[in-house]
Amino acid sequence: MDFTNLKNTDPELLDMIKKEEERQEYNIELIASENFTSLSVMESMGSLLTNKYAEGYPHKRYYGGCEFVDEVEDLARERLKKLFAAEHANVQPHSGSQANMAVYMSVLQTGDTILGMDLSHGGHLTHGSPVNFSGKLYNFISYGVDKETETIDYEKLKKIALENRPKMIVSGASAYPRIIDFQKIREICDEIDAYMMVDMAHIAGLVATGLHPSPVPYADFVTTTTHKTLRGPRGGAILCKEKYAKAVDKAIFPGIQGGPLMHTIAAKAVCFGEALREDYKEYMQQVVKNTKVLGEELKNYGFRLISGGTDNHLLLIDLTNKNITGKDAEKLLDSVGITVNKNTIPFETLSPFITSGIRIGTPAVTTRGFKEEEMKKIAYFMNYSIEHREENLSQIKEQIKEICKKYPLYQNA
């Protein structure tokens, strides 16, 4: 991208951006929640739309001069509704966390009981963690995975729901590698007359392309981020049934946010448009293929995959048998140019700052053009680095850099 002005006005900051650019260019990015946006997304975010205040919603603003940003937001909403066959869409949430907060506030009262997935079993901070607003403002109880299969125990979920009769059941996850049965969860919600909310932040791209069953027909509310598998700007969005539209919109503004970020909403419109194209479906299909191959190769090297494998874009790996913690593995792999994140595993025995596992995903490397052969090489690099962690790994680092050079991030930037 062109940084001519920044070069003249703030070379100190530009130097930091350039260092991060180099890190992204020459590292294999395996953090499951990260991706690389298109140049079109970045251009939209860097546009003069950032100058415009637009409190309210299209055609009902609290400021003048909003006729063109109204068009932008309308475009984003219509594309998002089309992408997921939804009745109503709100594209103003600044993040997935704020999207979740708005849904809770739209129909619940402080202190109401909500059933959500345990964070250490693959849930998310905003699904009831005691250190998060969700756990502080609401009475969250949790469900998790079966100890043997390491997949969601729907019977136990139902039992907990019947015993506690929560006002809402939240599903969706940040570290769960299997298909989620939204129909089953809907049936449980109906049995206890509870709202159903799905946080599909991680799997939105899979849902959009039919590679994971859609929660939209079943859920009252669906939240997502726009920067993971959707490959857009950092931000959030909410889909809901038409009957909840006013309550959701009111919860976002004036409930928890003021002015929307119109430059980000423009970038969301771009990414929704990209996700409606056929080449995006091919991309997501390759993500799933890559993840399966990477998982099988790692299993061949003796890594234990939580639940035995994957149905989506990510893998959760128990490193106990490799005699290394998630924290140490993250640091080690980072030193050779592979970026992962430490992650708790179900029935974790270590601190969340240490962890027994790591979480990896293929959306970012697939965006670069990596395919099955590269997945085999990544598995080799990971295994070799961990098995030979006391040795000099400069050769591995160099090989990783060479692969990255073959698949440059932005060829025409």
Curated annotation (Swiss-Prot):
Leading EC class: transferase
E.C. numbers: 2.1.2.1
Catalytic reaction(s) noted: (6R)-5,10-methylene-5,6,7,8-tetrahydrofolate + glycine + H2O = (6S)-5,6,7,8-tetrahydrofolate + L-serine
Chief site of localization: cytoplasm
List of residues binding (6S)-5,6,7,8-tetrahydrofolate: 119, 123-125, 351-353
GO terms assigned for molecular function: glycine hydroxymethyltransferase activity; pyridoxal phosphate binding
Pathway participation: One-carbon metabolism; tetrahydrofolate interconversion; Amino-acid biosynthesis; glycine biosynthesis; glycine from L-serine: step 1/1
GO cellular component: cytoplasm; cytosol
Keyword flag Protein biosynthesis: no
Gene Ontology BP, a term: tetrahydrofolate metabolic process
Record-stated family: Belongs to the SHMT family.
HAMAP family linked: SHMT
Assembly description: Homodimer.
Full protein name: Serine hydroxymethyltransferase
Taxonomic source organism: Clostridium botulinum (strain Hall / ATCC 3502 / NCTC 13319 / Type A)
UniProt gene name: glyA
